[in-house]
């Protein structure tokens, strides 16, 4: 492992793995810091408690002022800076403002490259076949058998022609019969070997694609939410389906065909020299130009294949989004507009396909012409050699067949190379997804003792911007305390960041600075999976999966396999959902459709509440859970919510009086800060308070000499 030089700079996020290292000696060259993992660990082990400010390890205490000054400014909120003693001044200008002006963002996938591993992409492709090496080795063995038998045929057929061409003896018929019988058996063995080869390659290919898709899906689900903010769903689906299939073919069927073509070409060339060295030298002079053409064509095809896969991903994304929102399209009558948009995307794909077709036509046309010229040159030169008695008719026939096989094999190698380049083009993005490390830890960190766990929450001096919109500040010095077992309501104007509070509590994002704590522990120190297992959420528009009602409710349990039907039904009863569920023809086995489209808003809400009940969380987050419901459904849902909130730490994000008035504490959020706090009654007593104005806008308050609270009228 190469250690960084004294002029090297390392940026480490305040939470998460090391990101980038930059060395001024090589200008803008970027390394992933994972290459220096042991050194990174040594550095980070010397840094004290996370979140306590930037601290340099003792060996680097003499760091000059440039980096030190930047470290104590806004940059310290984002990264730790570790540098050699001569790194500061050349780099200071690059580090002003954002966390790293001269360093590319790992989350920007358009710039991000896969981690350097010391292997080429070809070796990465071959690395996929390692788990199947047993079957593939057997397939290669059968490939060798079938190739040897195939390439021995011209030699023996040439001998048969010589036997037929010369004057036959008395035993001519018997000899010919025996020779043909032996060759028939040999050819049958070759056919069997080839069939077994194809089966082993096909089955191995399917296993590789299956494993590749599973690994890719697992890697995608482990990424932080900010990754999905920047990456389109349709693109990920295309990588998961089309690219994996293309890559799988490249390392199995295509690799098998390439090995076969290479073996046959090698044996064929050897036999051509065995039959007639002078004729072989004359004929094979055309191979180098074809090889150069194949390399140029392959490189062009690789770039074109990547562009084609990207264009296909864009078309898939558009189709997936539009089909998923067909009701909105139908409501606005925009069917033909969307057809035109999709047609434009597939037309781009067609243009790329036409470019590929033109390139293939030129290359394979040139390869075919070369093959025909080879045959013609063999006939011409071979005829001259026969005329001078240097070749027999059988030898010329054998040579022609070998030349034919070599020509086919060269064509097969050309196809192999072009398909390999396609696989590499598709594999580039797959390697990025497979090797991408999430910025937030997935399943590591501290777990609190269940016996002492209370569920007290606190935001302290939180500053936050969404990674996809770093220029828009959401929170500025935001602080809020939610005692254990209390019910806190958070209200504020639209866009003030109320739902962002839920995202931070679930640790879907980390704050730029400040802390979010649970029972006094910074949640960035806690295991995210454990943390989320203790939090239940019910949102304004809950998302259900396209499966049965029972499966959707059971989804809230920690262990799906241990959930009983009685537990599901009990949760549904407490959530006021059992009655309408049992009215369905299939009851709890009723499939709810994509995103629960076959259910009403109130029904989806109550199923979501049942799902949260089955989870039995210590902390409950309600995000506008009743705002989109009519009066009847709101009453049923609110009744279920009241049962759900018993004995839990609850944060309610709402503007409906029925939801807010029973809260122990109300906090008003505006411009990224808590501007008012107190009980519902206390806040209403402030004549110019924002809370009172919000209540007026929602028609909760009327002035008739006395204050009365009225529910807003609904159409």
From Swiss-Prot:
Sites bearing N6-acetyllysine, chain numbering: 230
Substrates-to-products reaction catalysed: biliverdin IXalpha(in) + ATP + H2O = biliverdin IXalpha(out) + ADP + phosphate + H(+)
EC number: 7.6.2.-
Induction (UniProt): By transcription factor GATA-1 during erythroid differentiation and in vitro, by DMSO during terminal erythroid maturation. Induced during cell erythroid differentiation.
Domain ABC transporter: 457-696
Tissues/organs with expression: Expressed at particularly high levels in fetal liver, and erythroid tissues of embryos and adults. Found also in adult bone marrow, liver and kidney, and at lower levels in heart, brain and spleen.
Ranges of residues in domain ABC transmembrane type-1: 136-422
Phenotype when changing residue 675 to A: Prevents ABCB10 glutathionylation
GO BP terms in the entry: erythrocyte development; export from the mitochondrion; heme biosynthetic process; mitochondrial unfolded protein response; positive regulation of erythrocyte differentiation; positive regulation of heme biosynthetic process; positive regulation of hemoglobin biosynthetic process
Mitochondrial matrix side: 83-133, 202-252, 299-357, 418-715
Regulation: Oxidized glutathione (GSSG) stimulates ATP hydrolysis without affecting ATP binding, whereas reduced glutathione (GSH) inhibits ATP binding and hydrolysis.
Family statement drawn from the similarity comment of this UniProt entry: Belongs to the ABC transporter superfamily. ABCB family. Mitochondrial peptide exporter (TC 3.A.1.212) subfamily.
Function of the protein: ATP-dependent transporter located in the mitochondrial inner membrane that catalyzes the export of biliverdin from the mitochondrial matrix, and plays a crucial role in hemoglobin synthesis and antioxidative stress. Participates in the early step of the heme biosynthetic process during insertion of iron into protoporphyrin IX (PPIX). Involved in the stabilization of the iron transporter mitoferrin-1/SLC25A37. In addition may be involved in mitochondrial unfolded protein response (UPRmt) signaling pathway, although ABCB10 probably does not participate in peptide export from mitochondria.
Protein name (Swiss-Prot/TrEMBL): ATP-binding cassette sub-family B member 10, mitochondrial
Biological source species: Mus musculus (Mouse)
Gene: Abcb10
């Amino acid at each position: 492992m190469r250690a960084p030089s004294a002029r090297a700079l390392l940026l480490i996020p305040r939470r998460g793995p090391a990101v980038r290292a930059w060395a001024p000696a090589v200008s803008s060259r970027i390394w992933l810091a994972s290459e220096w993992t042991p050194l990174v660990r040594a550095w980070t082990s010397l840094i004290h408690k996370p979140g306590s400010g930037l601290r340099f390890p003792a060996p680097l205490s003499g760091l000059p002022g440039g980096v030190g000054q930047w470290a104590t400014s806004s940059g310290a909120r984002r990264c730790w800076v570790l540098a050699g003693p001569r790194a500061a001044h050349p780099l200071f200008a690059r580090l002003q403002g954002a966390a790293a002006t001269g360093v590319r963002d790992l989350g920007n996938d358009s710039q991000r490259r896969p981690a350097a591993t010391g292997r080429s992409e070809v070796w990465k492709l071959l690395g996929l076949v390692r788990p199947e090496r047993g079957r593939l080795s057997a397939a290669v063995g059968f490939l060798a058998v079938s190739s040897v038998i195939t390439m021995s045929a011209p030699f023996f057929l040439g001998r048969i022609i010589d036997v037929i061409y010369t004057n036959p003896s008395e035993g001519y018929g018997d000899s010919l019969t025996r020779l043909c019988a032996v060759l028939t058996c040999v050819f049958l063995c070759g056919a069997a070997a080839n069939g077994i080869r194809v089966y082993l390659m096909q089955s191995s290919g399917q296993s590789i694609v299956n494993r590749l898709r599973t690994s890719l899906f697992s890697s995608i689900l482990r990424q932080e939410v900010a990754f999905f903010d920047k990456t389109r769903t349709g693109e990920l689906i295309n990588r998961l389906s089309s690219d994996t299939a293309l890559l799988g073919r490249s390392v199995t069927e295509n690799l098998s065909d390439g090995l076969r073509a290479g073996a046959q070409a090698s044996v064929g060339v050897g036999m051509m020299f065995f039959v007639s060295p002078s004729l072989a030298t004359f004929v094979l002079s055309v191979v180098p130009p074809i090889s150069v053409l194949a390399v140029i064509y392959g490189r062009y095809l690789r770039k074109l294949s990547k562009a084609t896969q990207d264009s296909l991903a864009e078309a898939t994304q558009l189709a997936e989004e539009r089909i998923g929102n067909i009701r909105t399209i139908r409501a606005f009558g925009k069917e033909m507009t969307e057809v035109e948009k999709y047609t434009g995307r597939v037309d781009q794909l067609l243009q790329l396909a036409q470019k590929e077709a033109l390139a293939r036509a030129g290359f394979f046309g040139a390869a075919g012409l070369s093959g025909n010229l080879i045959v013609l040159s063999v006939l011409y030169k071979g005829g001259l050699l026969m005329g001078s008695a240097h070749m027999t008719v059988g030898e010329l026939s054998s040579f022609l067949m070998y030349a034919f096989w070599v020509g086919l094999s060269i064509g097969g190698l050309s196809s192999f190379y072009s398909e390999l380049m396609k696989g590499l083009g598709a594999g580039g993005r797959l390697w990025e997804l497979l090797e991408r490390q999430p910025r937030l830890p997935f399943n590591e960190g501290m777990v609190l003792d269940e016996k002492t766990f209370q569920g007290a929450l606190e935001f302290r001096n939180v500053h936050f911007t969404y990674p996809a919109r770093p220029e828009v500040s959401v929170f500025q010095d935001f602080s809020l305390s939610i005692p254990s077992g209390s019910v806190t309501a958070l209200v504020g104007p639209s866009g003030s960041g109320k739902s962002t509070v839920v995202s931070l509590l679930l640790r879907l994002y980390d704050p730029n600075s400040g802390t979010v704590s649970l029972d006094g522990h910074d949640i960035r120190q806690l295991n995210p999976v454990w943390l989320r297992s203790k939090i239940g959420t019910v949102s304004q528009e809950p998302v259900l999966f396209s499966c049965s009602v029972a499966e959707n409710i059971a989804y809230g349990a920690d262990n799906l396999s241990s959930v009983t039907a009685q537990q599901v039904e009990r949760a549904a009863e407490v959530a006021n959902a059992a009655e309408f569920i049992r009215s369905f023809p299939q009851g709890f086995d009723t499939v709810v459709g994509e995103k629960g489209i076959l259910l009403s808003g109130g029904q989806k809400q109550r199923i979501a509440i049942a799902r949260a009940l089955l989870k039995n969380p210590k902390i409950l987050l309600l995000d506008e859970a009743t705002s989109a419901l009519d009066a009847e459904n709101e009453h049923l849902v609110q009744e279920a919510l009241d049962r759900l909130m018993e004995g839990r730490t609850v944060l309610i994000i709402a503007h409906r009086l029925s939801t807010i008035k029973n809260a122990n504490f109300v906090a008003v959020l505006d411009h990224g800060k808590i501007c008012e706090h107190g009980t519902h009654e206390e806040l209403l007593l402030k004549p110019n308070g924002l809370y009172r104005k919000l209540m007026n806008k929602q028609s909760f308050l009327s002035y008739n000499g006395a204050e009365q609270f009225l529910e807003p009228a609904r159409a």
